Regions:
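C-terminal/domain-terminus segments
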Residues: 1, 7, 38-41, 45, ...
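Short, low-complexity, polar/charged sequence segments that are solvent-exposed and flexible
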Residues: 9-10, 63-68, 113
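Glycine-rich loops and low-complexity Gly/Arg-rich segments
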Residues: 13-14, 69-72, 115-119
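Amphipathic terminal alpha-helices
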Residues: 89-91, 96-102, 106-121
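Broad hydrophobic/π-residue packing in well-ordered secondary structure
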Residues: 14-18, 26, 41-44, 105, ...
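Residue-level detector of transmembrane insertion/anchoring sites
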Residues: 8-11, 87, 100
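Mid/C-terminal beta-alpha module of Rossmann-like enzyme folds, strongest
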Residues: 23-90, 94-96
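Substrate-positioning beta->alpha
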Residues: 1-31
Length: 121
């Protein structure tokens, strides 16, 4: 349990999946097994949504510390710093291609939502 939104944001910032995305994946999974009998147990990876492109991640902060964050969230840069969030921290994007293929999973919660939530931080 987190005492406030900013504590939760610091945890999410490191790489996490929002409960809404987990719930969506569970519903999609139940739908899948109700439609077909699987020959094997699936192990599927969930991840957050990202505004960053693969090219952004491959060339993270090529223009200086925090530059990739500023490219997408410049209006939140000072806010992020004020709450101890590191805009230079490169996210670890997990491979969810099998999850997308099997379930049609599309995560919706990203840093953009985290930073723009009403009353956030």
């Amino acid at each position: 349990m987190y005492t406030n939104y900013s504590d939760w944001a610091r945890w999410f910032w490191k790489g996490a999946v929002h409960i809404d995305d987990v719930a969506a994946a569970v519903i999609l999974s139940v739908d899948l097994i109700s439609r077909q009998q699987l020959r094997r147990h699936l192990i599927l990876t969930l991840d957050s949504a990202y505004e960053y492109t693969d090219a952004d991640l491959d060339h993270w902060d090529a223009d200086g510390a925090g530059s990739t964050f500023k490219k997408y969230y410049s209006e939140y840069y000072d806010l992020a710093l004020s709450y101890g969030l590191d805009p230079a921290l490169k996210p670890t994007k997990l491979d969810i291609s099998e999850t997308v293929r099997w379930l049609g999973y599309r995560p919706s919660y990203s840093l953009a939502r985290l930073l723009s939530e009403p009353g956030s931080l």
